[in-house]
């Protein structure tokens, strides 16, 4: 399946996998999805990820995290902010705080993909891709 918006496709696949309590989900690999997966791993939203396959057919396999006996997903909400039809940009001073700092905003900056906190520390703004909490 070919997706025009790979970020929305990635977020939807993660959201659907969490809804049915799957342990892993597969996502087509791009530089952007690999960078977002690294941010999710660094922030503790996913356990791990690995790239399987080669070339254009390569996939990222994300290992999702759950808590408790009922296996409640660590990721409760994934929201796409900047979309292909309406881009959302923010400077470093106006970057949003998601749920007062409990969640994260993933930002695409000139220094790479990072969280809103890292972007504030480095004093860079950019395109606000999504909110996660």
Curated annotation (Swiss-Prot):
Name one matching Pfam family.
Answer: Ribosomal_S8
Gene3D superfamilies, sorted: 3.30.1370.30, 3.30.1490.10
Spell out the molecular function terms from Gene Ontology.
rRNA binding; structural constituent of ribosome
Disulfides per UniProt: none
Q: Name one GO biological process term.
A: translation
Question: Which keywords does the record carry?
Answer: Ribonucleoprotein, Ribosomal protein, RNA-binding, rRNA-binding
Instruction: State the source organism's domain of life.
Output: Bacteria
Can you name a GO cellular component term? ribonucleoprotein complex
Summarize the protein's role: One of the primary rRNA binding proteins, it binds directly to 16S rRNA central domain where it helps coordinate assembly of the platform of the 30S subunit.
UniProt lists the family membership as follows: Belongs to the universal ribosomal protein uS8 family.
Q: How does it assemble?
A: Part of the 30S ribosomal subunit. Contacts proteins S5 and S12.
Instruction: Please identify the protein, giving its name as recorded.
Output: Small ribosomal subunit protein uS8
Name the gene.
Answer: rpsH
